[in-house]
Amino acid sequence: MSKNEKKIWITGASSGIGKAVAEKFAKEGWQVAISARRKEILDDMAKNPNIFSYPLDVVDEDNCKNTFLKIITEFKEIDLCIFCSGTYDPKKEKEINIKQSKFVMDVNYFGVLNCVKAVEKYFKERKGGHISIVSSIAGYRGLPNSS
């Protein structure tokens, strides 16, 4: 990696918006660190010479910190973080499962906070960089079977 290359960390990169964003940035020549729980998909994506796999479960705060430290050690710097991790479990009101609902909150809300917490000190000390948080339409309006 050269010093002039832009560098990005993307979570939720194994599918959906995160995967599409990772592929787009890699195509444009960015060095892309990708994270998600599904290591086998990340490793397949890392066949692209601009993509590097860093498996991660965003629910684990320490894992978020350690993964970011590993990325910084290897990339030397990060210009942009895009946090796309999310999960969706559509249920009718009679099928709601508290344990699953807590898991959705852990990933979609607390997982993002864990990632922001992992990078905030780095960006403050560097006096630069950007964080983007991506969610789906599910956060703005109701969808069928999403009580």
Feature annotation, model-predicted:
Residues 136:
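Residue(s) in the substrate-gating loop at a strand-loop-helix junction
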Residues 94, 141-147:
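Active-site loop immediately N-terminal to the catalytic Tyr-X3-Lys motif
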Residues 28-45:
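Conserved glycine-rich Rossmann-like NAD(P)H-binding loop of the short-chain dehydrogenase/reductase
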Residues 14-15:
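Conserved glycine-rich cofactor-binding loop
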Residues 84-89:
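Conserved NAD(P)H cofactor-binding loop of Rossmann-fold oxidoreductase domains
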Residues 48-62:
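Rossmann-fold cofactor-recognition segment
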Residues 92-93, 97-105:
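Substrate-binding pocket helix/loop in short-chain dehydrogenase/reductase
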